[in-house]
Amino acid sequence: MKKLWKILLLAAVCASLLTGCFVEDVEMSAERVEAASGEESYADWAVYWYNCGSDLESKWGCASGDIKEMLSVDLSDKVQVVVQTGGAKKWHNTQMDADKLQRYVYNSDGFYLVDEQPRGNMGSPETLADFLKFCKSHYPAAHTAVVFWNHGGGSVDGAAFDENYDYDSLKLNEFYQAFQSAFDLSTDNPPIDVVGFDTCLMATVDTAYTFCDIARYLVASEETEPGCGWYYTGWLEALSENPGMDGAELGKVICDAFEKGCQDEEVADEITLSVTDLSRIGNLMEAYESLGQEALLNAVDNPGFFPAMGRMASRAENYGGNTEDEGYTNMVDLGDLAYHCAELLPESANAVREALADCVTYKVNGPYRAKATGLSCYYSYNSDKKDYSGFADIAACDAFTYLYGYEIDGSLDDRGMAYLNGIGFEREELAEVPTLEDVSTEQDYPVYIDDEGNAVMDIGPDIANMLKGVYFRLVYVDEEQDIAILLGRDNNIYMDWENGVFQDNFQGTWGAIDGYLAYMELIYESNDYNTYMVPILLNGEKYNLRVVYDYNDGQYYILGARKGLDANGMADKNLVQLQPGDEITTLHYVASMSGDDSFALYEMDTFKVTESTSFGEVDMGDGEFAMMFELVDAHNNTTWSEMAVFTVEDGVIRTEAAE
């Protein structure tokens, strides 16, 4: 059994290595004309569309698809759209040239190419600034909207990842630099009516603060967007029919059109899109800073606060994937985080939710993003120093910057200590932040079998208070066939956090696609539903199937397939829906019992998708299964329990502790 324990431990480590739209080439043409002068082109509304095609265009033609949606609208003479295209190695239409930055105008007269520049980096603030100046000079309007189209990476990584320049992106401070060079900025009279992000993950409190003297309204998504993105036909038609609408009305129209478009494509389960009134952001920033201050003072008074907050953050709705498998965006819904931290932070949590409700004037969200309040914030789920450093460069809140700095480094610099002193902290030194490494030994936490045959881990309240989560890993074992198969990670265990006692809930069942056992990894847990990542090959390409378990009806639902974050922090915008005839191959980590303990990723079962393809639990039948509890602290350090072994024979489960 000692050999089996090593296999299970290696499986848990190896598991961390796992990691729609498609448009045919579009017929499109634009007459080449000179750019208009400002006076002759003045309109009620001008939309400045910064279209960084990236691999969304070169692989799938998503940008061409949205431009085609625009061209299907008969615009009135009150509305015009100025589009800059770039950032893609290839365009799926007959007009755009990937070797140039091109500027087009679409209005009541037609579609025109009005300017060309040599290829430039769409992830550069200078490129954006030049486009904004061009639009301001040649195509002014009474009301303006600036729309960014591409990938998004949240507060730290920004948006507009140019695949021609190593996926360089515009960070929030670079967005600000570009607008500042093109416009006179003012919180009382911002130059832009609406700034919109048709990207993933950019409805953040840091984004809102960045644009508060640039625009009146922010329209963006907290979650990753489906590949279909915004429905340009819908909202541009509405704007053309009613050019007298203001920014708030336009934001609502964009949200409603987006929701309808996603529903039509059957990808609306996890959507989010919100409209934020940036003139009201000041009250939210004050409340957000107060929340951070209360958290920081709690943490320096008792560093055990960090795992307690970590448990609340893991329950709060978070976006883009925050696991080793999917990558970390470190973005969590601000309102839901405040809700879960209400007992930890009673003086400030409710004020945050009230301020959010005041400044988020409209939002849409799918049934499995029901807790979205409109803006997300940064939370360091992975305690990564490099990612935290990126956050510190753009953070809209000093208190949370110092809070995460203390959690990750265990100390604060002189500025951090001065900030602490300014909010009432009087000691000269900070206590060390406790981690599992401080109490770890060569022995794993013991497991015993109680009188009812349950595997129990009793770590006591002191160790439990260091943890932000407890999970389990399950492996199928066949000693006769000399094989061990990792089944996955879940939280379906009984938890007594107050006393530090955790107990298995093994029932001999596991998740499967059409009856074929699947590796499944918990990536989000809440009282209403859990979300799982299931690695597969889909028509020969590796994807993560997204599956939810809905506690309301006790059913699993397949939402679609998506790839995780890439090395640049870029979220995959293309949620692929399974289609009848698609080929799925399940992926598992497999090791021999007698070999060198190394796990390898194997293709297991291959089958075709049908109209009735579904995910559900199946009885695994007779066999031997091994489980370990997984303990995770506030720093994302992980340690393990000893192993429990379940032997199932004729439907009867016998449990024993491994020797």
Question: What role is predicted for each listed range?
Answer:
Residues 11-15:
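Alpha-helical transmembrane segments
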Residues 17-20:
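C-terminal motif of bacterial Sec signal peptides marking the signal peptidase cleavage site
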Residues 22-140:
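N-terminal extension/subdomain marker
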Residues 1-8:
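Bacterial N-terminal signal peptides that target proteins for export
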Residues 85-187, 199-200, 205, 222-223:
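Catalytic-core segments of thiol-dependent peptidases
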Residues 26-40, 137, 159-197, 202-659:
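Terminal, contiguous helix-loop blocks that mediate binding/assembly
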Residues 46-51, 80-85, 144-148, 193-197, ...:
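Structural recognition of the beta-strand scaffold that forms the well-ordered cores
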